[in-house]
Amino acid sequence: MSRFLVFALLLAGCQAQPPPAKPLVIRITTGLPGMTFKPLGEALATAFQAVITDARFEVIETAGSVANLQRLESGNADLGFALADVAYTAFNGRGMDFPTAAKNVRALAVLHPSAVHVLVPANSTARSVADLRGRIGVGPAGSGTAVTSALLLNAFGVSPKQITNQSLPFITASDALSAGELEAAFVVAADPVDAVQRATNAGARLIEIGGDQVRRLRVEYPFLRPGFIPGGTYKREPRSIQTMLVDVLLLTRVDLDEELVRRLTSVLFDVLPQLSASHDFLRMMDVRRAPATPIPLHPGAALYYREQELSR
């Protein structure tokens, strides 16, 4: 063997090896402490991590649905939760929060319904959303509650001139209601909700949502549907409360890998029984409705649902 060939082989052996590829990071954008999105995101991250070991899952705390959709649209998150009405509004470019349609967002699944809670002080004369006046806790800026409360106030004919919006965290709004600093507060979340429990323990009551206004609202937003807060869920509320339900969606970005999204969707349904054992609200998830999202499904999620149909 020539000296030149030996030298070349030695040199090749000394070449620096390329660094190992960095693991894929999947960012899950969630919600505020005390609400359902954050613990659900943490539970899903743990479940995904146990199965999809070639990726790393991170949980991001946010104000909620609006912030999550904005992060997904801008590429600053990979998975996230949002109320169905907010996702529909974002995808179609409606409202102040989404002047441009969020066309990069896609759906994985309908997860579970959230209930609309409208709280008023015990001595309030309000019996309907139409009666609300003054300082109203409409939900934190960036939350789904802020969008849903605006839809309901408008549907019930409450003029912006008749109220002062207070964009407070839910626990803060609960305490402000008890202290006489708010005339009402909205909370949209799966029961039971810590902030609602806190308010009712201090004497607040829930008002019902129903009537022609709701029927008209559903013409434009059919995924808002009538429902009930079961009696006994909250102190001083022994009877069921008529309200509206809105689904929670698990969302992703359109550019996320199709096979990865198929795997994520598969893991979601594989671990659903275990998750439901520790998160009561997931027991309300109807797997038959999972693909019935108000915005387009990601191709990877659609592939999973087609596979399930073929396997039956």
Regions found by a protein language model. Give the residues of each.
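Sec-dependent signal peptide recognition
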Residues: 1-7
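C-terminal motif of bacterial Sec signal peptides marking the signal peptidase cleavage site
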Residues: 11-13
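Bacterial signal peptide processing site
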Residues: 15-17
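Bilobed "Venus flytrap"/periplasmic-binding protein-like clamshell domains
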Residues: 23-51, 55, 113-179, 291, ...
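Extracytoplasmic small-molecule ligand-binding "clamshell" domains
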Residues: 36-73, 78-80, 236-238
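Pocket-lining segment of extracytoplasmic ligand-binding domains
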Residues: 84-86, 94-96, 124, 158-250, ...
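A structural signal for short loop-to-beta-strand junctions that line the ligand-binding cleft
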Residues: 98-111, 116, 233-242
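Segments of small-molecule ligand-sensing domains
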Residues: 241-312
